[in-house]
């Protein structure tokens, strides 16, 4: 008798779990149910001026996560991400390491590898030629994965006019 009671309890628990699974409201993955309510696609342009290699690596982990996130990828249209480099950030995407300490080189290499992977992932990458001039960076030293634009602010404005959200990375 006790054996049938245990089997009945297990069956009841399985049935309850099944029923709860069907009747429970869906939970948005990642907890973005408010932020992404009604959103069909994530479009973001990152306005990048941060010049610290270590800080930039930490930030770019999060930037990469924006378009790799399962919830974002689950929207009806794939994410579109652009990054516009200007200010001190232009030094991070250059093969010229002058002005950096040797202990920064590994962080710069890591950052540049992240940029290469982002390009392969379809991220649009642009550098402001005006910023290169102001920062004294030779345009020929910029990673080949990055497109040159005359004025990065015009690019940011253009992306915003196309519906991209602007995210400043000071």
Each language-model region and where it sits:
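N-terminal secretory signal peptides that target proteins for export/translocation
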Residues: 1-7
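Secreted/extracellular ectodomain signature
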Residues: 27-170
